[in-house]
């Protein structure tokens, strides 16, 4: 499957470069397109030209690229246009070893496959406490029972209220609410001024401390915590105190937008509004794969096929912009006038 996806990606990327007839083509592009177009035309009875000039020729090349993307993704989209019929025989062209794939395309596909077969720490986009079901007001002392109490202020900040002379461990408070956290990077600080339950202003006692695995860490210093070593807090003073913990970032074994290179800009390109026709075509392809058709997913993709699909569809968007095909999609009405922000916003809603 890697070879088929790499060949499709190589052909689609090569087609981006052929729109200017005055430019000499790269030898690698000529070899790739020469073989790919011959195989495609022979199997599908199409007549794609290597140097498309007319609108019909540009349409034919874009349809070939669409066929190759769909074949690589094993997607059949059915009747979506009076001008385009998917050529199911395209997979036969991609399966042949005659079509070369370029180094970058194969590296991209192999990187995706390799990364999705294993796990590694990557930076998480959401805050560690985004899954908390309740929060509390910052700087408001609240210990209904016992001598210490911790709570969440927002998705990145937690606070610990302590009576005079109190101490305790805060591992459960600081650990993320979901996922397999590897390392958490936080800073802690005492709240200089806070309010008691009646609203009176109080000052934290001097000498409050935090230890990680028995080692004192200074307020304001970045602490790298593995979520296992004990994190203890103490208030040896004679007054109540509040300590604030701010998580700067943390890493997890969960998939992220850094799992493979350039995943974030690839998603942006996939879901960018190029035209009503492209907007509909992209939606149909993703719907057939049970992926988000209009807006990017809430969480980063977790499956190899999803990431390969994003890479191929983003490249198909580049070809669409380069070739400027003109064809109809069922149910799509061409907008009147220029595309503007209001029209695009309406398309996403």
UniProtKB/Swiss-Prot annotation:
The superkingdom of the source organism is: Viruses
Specify whether Methyltransferase is a keyword of the entry: no
- Glycosylation, residue list: 45
Q: How does it assemble?
A: Homotrimer.
Keyword flag Glycoprotein: yes
Q: Where in the cell is it found?
A: Virion
Q: Which UniProt keywords apply?
A: Capsid protein, Glycoprotein, Outer capsid protein, Virion
Q: Native species of this protein?
A: African horse sickness virus 6 (AHSV-6)
This one is known as Core protein VP7
Supply one GO molecular-function term: structural molecule activity
A biological process from GO: fusion of virus membrane with host plasma membrane
Read off the InterPro entries from this record: Capsid_hemagglutn (IPR008980), Orbi_VP7_capsid (IPR001803), Orbi_VP7_capsid_C (IPR023178), Orbi_VP7_capsid_N (IPR023176), Virus_capsid_a-hlx_vir (IPR008935)
Q: What does this protein do?
A: Major structural core protein; binds to structural protein VP3. Constitutes the surface of the AHSV core.
Q: What is the first-listed, main subcellular location in coarse terms?
A: virion
List the Pfam families hit by this protein, alphabetically: Orbi_VP7 (PF00897)
Assigned protein family:
Belongs to the orbivirus VP7 family.
GO CC annotation terms, alphabetical? viral envelope; viral outer capsid
């Amino acid at each position: 499957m890697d070879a088929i996806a790499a060949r499709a990606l190589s052909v689609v990327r090569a087609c981006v470069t052929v729109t200017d007839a005055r430019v000499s083509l790269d030898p690698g592009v000529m070899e790739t397109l020469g073989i790919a177009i011959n195989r495609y035309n022979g199997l599908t009875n199409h007549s794609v030209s290597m140097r498309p000039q007319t609108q019909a020729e540009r349409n034919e090349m874009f349809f070939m690229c669409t066929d190759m993307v769909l074949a690589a993704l094993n997607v059949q989209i059915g009747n979506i246009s009076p001008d385009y019929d998917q050529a199911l025989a395209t997979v036969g062209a991609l399966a042949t070893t005659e079509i070369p794939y370029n180094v970058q395309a194969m590296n991209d596909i192999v990187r995706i496959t390799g990364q999705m077969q294993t796990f590694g720490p990557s930076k998480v986009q959401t805050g560690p406490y985004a899954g908390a079901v309740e929060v509390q007001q910052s700087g408001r002392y609240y210990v209904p029972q016992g001598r210490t109490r911790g709570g969440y202020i927002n998705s990145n900040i937690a606070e610990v209220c302590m009576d005079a002379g109190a101490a305790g461990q805060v591992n459960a408070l600081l650990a993320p609410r979901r996922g397999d956290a590897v390392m958490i990077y936080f800073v802690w600080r005492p709240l200089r001024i806070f309010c008691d339950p009646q609203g009176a202003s109080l000052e934290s006692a001097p000498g409050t401390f935090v230890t990680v695995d028995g080692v004192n860490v200074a307020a304001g210093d970045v602490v790298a915590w593995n979520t296992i070593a004990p994190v203890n807090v103490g208030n040896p003073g004679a007054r109540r105190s509040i300590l604030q913990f701010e998580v700067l970032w943390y890493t997890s074994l969960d998939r992220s937008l850094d799992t493979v290179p350039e995943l974030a800009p690839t998603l942006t390109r996939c879901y960018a509004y190029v035209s009503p026709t492209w907007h509909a075509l992209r939606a149909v392809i993703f719907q057939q794969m049970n992926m988000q058709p209009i807006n990017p997913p809430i969480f980063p993709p977790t499956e190899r096929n999803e990431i390969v699909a994003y890479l191929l569809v983003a490249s198909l968007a580049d070809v669409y912009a380069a070739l400027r095909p003109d064809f109809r999609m069922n149910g799509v009405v061409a907008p009147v006038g220029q595309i503007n922000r209001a029209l695009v916003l309406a398309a996403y809603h």
